[in-house]
Structures are given as structure tokens and as C-alpha cells.
Swiss-Prot record:
Subunit structure: Homodimer. Interacts with UBE2E2. Interacts with PEG3. Interacts with VAV1, without mediating its ubiquitin-mediated degradation. Interacts with CACYBP/SIP. Probable component of some large E3 complex possibly composed of UBE2D1, SIAH2, CACYBP/SIP, SKP1, APC and TBL1X. Interacts with PEG10, which may inhibit its activity. Interacts with EGLN2 and SNCAIP. Interacts with DYRK2. Interacts with NR1D1 and NR1D2. Interacts with DCC. Interacts with AXIN1.
Tissues where the protein occurs: Widely expressed at low level.
Protein name: E3 ubiquitin-protein ligase SIAH2
Source lineage: Eukaryota, Metazoa, Chordata, Craniata, Vertebrata
Annotated spans, SBD: 130-322
UniProt organism field: Homo sapiens
SUPFAM superfamilies noted in UniProt: RING/U-box (SSF57850), TRAF domain-like (SSF49599)
Protein family according to the UniProt entry: Belongs to the SINA (Seven in absentia) family.
Chain intervals annotated as zinc finger (SIAH-type): 133-193
Cellular localization per UniProt: Cytoplasm; Nucleus
Phosphothreonine modification, residue list: T26, T119
Role of this protein: E3 ubiquitin-protein ligase that mediates ubiquitination and subsequent proteasomal degradation of target proteins. E3 ubiquitin ligases accept ubiquitin from an E2 ubiquitin-conjugating enzyme in the form of a thioester and then directly transfers the ubiquitin to targeted substrates. Mediates E3 ubiquitin ligase activity either through direct binding to substrates or by functioning as the essential RING domain subunit of larger E3 complexes.
S-S bonds: none
Posttranslational mods: Phosphorylated at Ser-28 by MAPK14, which mediates the degradation by the proteasome of EGLN3. Phosphorylated at Ser-28 by DYRK2; this increases the ubiquitin ligase activity and promotes degradation of EGLN3.
PANTHER family found in the cross-reference section: E3 UBIQUITIN-PROTEIN LIGASE SIAH2
């Protein structure tokens, strides 16, 4: 989608660096879109999958599909006796030849199998060669991922796997919750009750007290097309001495689902307009990377004041579906 035109961005409710006040709803006129006023807030093992190893040449890519008992037996040789994840290169053994993964090894004083010494470190080069010829299951196979991967590709895939647990998407709240996609909205409604939800494809996101000092987040939910979208406006000092606002829309859903939608943010007033149109990001991706790359609506405090009214900034938010 396009970058902001000579019109502008839009934003919403804080979940940030001070205790969040209750959102106030701005009375809407008869026909216009819904509007919510959001007050600024203050600062704010997975089990090893059923084995699905496939023999491949060294460095050979991933795959998916049924696996033989022999493959299961082979990959089971790499299971860590402590966490039951796989022991991947560099592979270290105790003096008796037992394996333990590098993460668990750092927490142990002796071998969990024979109680022998773990030092000095002894590389098991033979097992490393075998590991390079095997495809390992993704650690999230138990929740639906069917990929098997070379050990060099496994960590990177698992960092972005669609089947990994979802984290709380509320920015600035330092919430450590994790769970399934189906449980995200329930978590937000019970643990973050100050977040307002508005219904409809077109709403007005009214962020209040935008002149608050320091880093502040405004967050609001928008419900339409059978999905929930999270509207986020962040104010932060990305560059020293230069505060900026970043506005973005996230889908409470997968990356594939997000591709079915587009959003438009618009600042409008005083015979000026600033717009941004893009595809929403999945909450699996979060907002940090988008802000780092300025892949969202970005404007500084001077621009914000052109559209603000007594320290309050209204952003028009429109969600639409994309043609297949």
C-alpha cells in the first residue's frame, strides 16, 4: 500500500506509561461514524512435536508430510533429557557420551543421565554430522505446524511460526500473557478493561492529552467484518530531542487473514488532510518492527498540533476488504 500522501496519519488510545483512565465516549451526531475518546495512560516449552524427521542432504531445505517410525526413532536420539527439545549443533556431551541441549547445559552442574561431569566440553562430531542430514519437526508441531526443517533453519522459522503462542498485543502494558489466538480477545477484555471497542468499518479514534510528556500509547479496538482490529498510536522519541507519533492497525488474526483487509488512517481539519493506507499487520508481528522501519503513519508534534483541538487528536479509521 502507499506511504502517507500529503494528507496524514491517524491514531488511538493509550496503554502506556501512567495508569490508564477510563475511556470517555464522544457523543456522535446522527449519521457520522462512531467516535471514542481515549485518555492517555501512563508508562507502561513447548512440548516436542511428534517427530517428523526426513533424511536430506546437508543444508537441504524443509518439508512437510507423513513420517516413518524410523524417522521418529532417529530424531528421538536428539531429544534433550531435561526439556525434551532437540539437541542441535554444536552438540556437546558428558564424559560418558550423553547429550543435553545447550540451553539446559548452562543451568546444570552434572549430567542429568549419569550424574557425571559436564566439563570439560566435549564435541560430538558424529552426531553433528547426523543432525546435518536430518530434518527436524518445528517445536510447534503439537499446535498444528507440519514443517520439518534443517537444524540451521529451525530457530528462525520458530521465531515467526504462525502456530507459536500469541503474546498480549497491548503495547506499553508490560503484560507477559501468552495463549492461543482464540484466547486473545478474552484476555484483552478481562485484563485490559480500559480499552474501548467500537463497531463499524468507519470510526473516529480520539486520542486525548497528546501533549503529555514522555512516551505514551493510545489503544482502541475496532470490530467489523467479523474480526477485531487493534488501533495503536504511540508517541516516542525515536531520535534524541525529536518526538514523533506512530499510528498503525493490527488484526487480531493471522498474517494470511490480514492480507484480506486494508486500512486507511486520516487526519483532517483546518483545510488540511494527511492520510495513510496499508495492509494491517497481524498481532503476531506486533508494532515494534513497523515503527522501527516507519512502515506506518508517522508525524511529528508540529504536524499533530495542526490537527489537534485543545490537546485532543481525532483520527478517522476506515477498514475495508481486499478483492481476492
Amino acid at each position: 500500500m502507499s506511504r502517507p500522501s500529503s494528507t496524514g496519519p491517524s491514531a488511538n488510545k493509550p496503554c502506556s506509561k501512567q495508569p490508564p483512565p477510563q475511556p470517555q465516549h464522544t457523543p456522535s451526531p446522527a449519521a457520522p461514524p462512531a467516535a471514542a475518546t481515549i485518555s492517555a495512560a501512563g508508562p507502561g516449552s513447548s512440548a516436542v512435536p511428534a517427530a517428523a524427521a526426513v533424511i536430506s542432504g546437508p543444508g537441504g531445505g524443509g518439508g512437510a508430510g507423513p513420517v516413518s517410525p524410523q524417522h521418529h526413532e532417529l530424531t528421538s536420539l536428539f531429544e534433550c533429557p531435561v526439556c525434551f527439545d532437540y539437541v542441535l549443533p554444536p552438540i556437546l556431551q558428558c564424559q560418558a557420551g550423553h547429550l543435553v541441549c545447550n540451553q539446559c547445559r548452562q543451568k546444570l552442574s552434572c549430567c542429568p543421565t549419569c550424574r557425571g561431569a559436564l566439563t570439560p566440553s566435549i564435541r560430538n562430531l558424529a552426531m553433528e554430522k547426523v543432525a546435518s542430514a536430518v530434518l527436524f519437526p518445528c517445536k510447534y508441531a503439537t499446535t498444528g505446524c507440519s514443517l520439518t526443517l534443517h537444524h540451521t533453519e529451525k530457530p528462525e522459522h520458530e521465531d515467526i511460526c504462525e502456530y507459536r503462542p500469541y503474546s498480549c498485543p497491548c503495547p506499553g502494558a508490560s503484560c507477559k500473557w501468552q495463549g492461543s489466538l482464540e484466547a486473545v480477545m478474552s484476555h484483552l477484555m478481562h485484563a485490559h478493561k480500559s480499552i474501548t471497542t467500537l463497531q463499524g468499518e468507519d470510526i473516529v479514534f480520539l486520542a486525548t492529552d497528546i501533549n503529555l510528556p514522555g512516551a505514551v500509547d493510545w489503544v482502541m479496538m475496532q470490530s467489523c467484518f467479523g474480526h477485531h482490529f487493534m488501533l495503536v498510536l504511540e508517541k516516542q522519541e525515536k531520535y534524541e530531542g525529536h518526538q514523533q507519533f506512530f499510528a498503525i492497525v493490527l488484526l487480531i488474526g493471522t498474517r494470511k487473514q490480514a492480507e484480506n483487509f486494508a486500512y486507511r488512517l486520516e487526519l483532517n481539519g483546518n483545510r488540511r488532510r494527511l492520510t495513510w493506507e496499508a495492509t494491517p499487520r497481524s498481532i503476531h508481528d506486533g508494532v515494534a518492527a513497523a515503527i522501527m522501519n516507519s512502515d506506518c503513519l508517522v508525524f511529528d508534534t508540529a504536524i499533530a498540533h495542526l490537527f489537534a483541538d485543545n490537546g485532543n487528536l481525532g483520527i478517522n479509521v476506515t477498514i475495508s476488504t481486499c478483492c481476492p
